[in-house]
């Protein structure tokens, strides 16, 4: 892994809107967050193994970009490393960039629903 940050993206979020807008969104994220390892989900459930793989490759920050389901999958993948957590070993920080239809999790966590503002918040976070 070349980068400390992995972004797991559900391109079908918001009914495929994210896939359509990705050529505009990616440069904003790269500029705001710096170099990223980007992994795209292909089907429901992919977020979990992609998060697990990011940890195994040494990611220090794993971000979920999509809807609440994508965030849940990615968080579940990170939580599979309970052995590392129990041993007191470092596990990656987790963040979200809301891009789904409802944005409920983003609202609950106080994460801006605007993609650029959410990325700026991640960039300023202590876990970076």
Walk through the language-model features, giving the residues of each:
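ATP/NTP phosphate-donor binding region
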Residues: 1-62, 72, 76, 116
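Glycine-rich beta-strand-to-loop/alpha-helix junction loops that act as flexible
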Residues: 11, 65-67, 97-99
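Catalytic core of DAGKc-family lipid kinases
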Residues: 31-32, 41, 79-128
């Amino acid at each position: 892994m070349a980068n400390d940050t992995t972004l797991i993206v559900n391109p079908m979020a918001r009914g495929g809107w994210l896939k359509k807008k990705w050529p505009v969104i990616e440069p904003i994220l790269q500029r705001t967050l710096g170099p990223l390892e980007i992994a795209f989900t292909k089907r429901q459930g992919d977020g979990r193994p992609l998060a697990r793989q990011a940890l195994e490759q040494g990611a220090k920050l794993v971000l979920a970009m999509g809807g609440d389901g994508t965030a849940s999958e990615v968080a579940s993948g990170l939580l599979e490393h309970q052995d590392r957590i129990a041993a007191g070993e470092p596990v990656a920080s987790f963040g979200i960039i809301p891009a789904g239809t409802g944005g409920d999790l983003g609202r609950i966590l106080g994460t801006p629903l605007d993609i650029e503002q959410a990325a700026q918040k991640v960039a300023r976070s202590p876990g970076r």
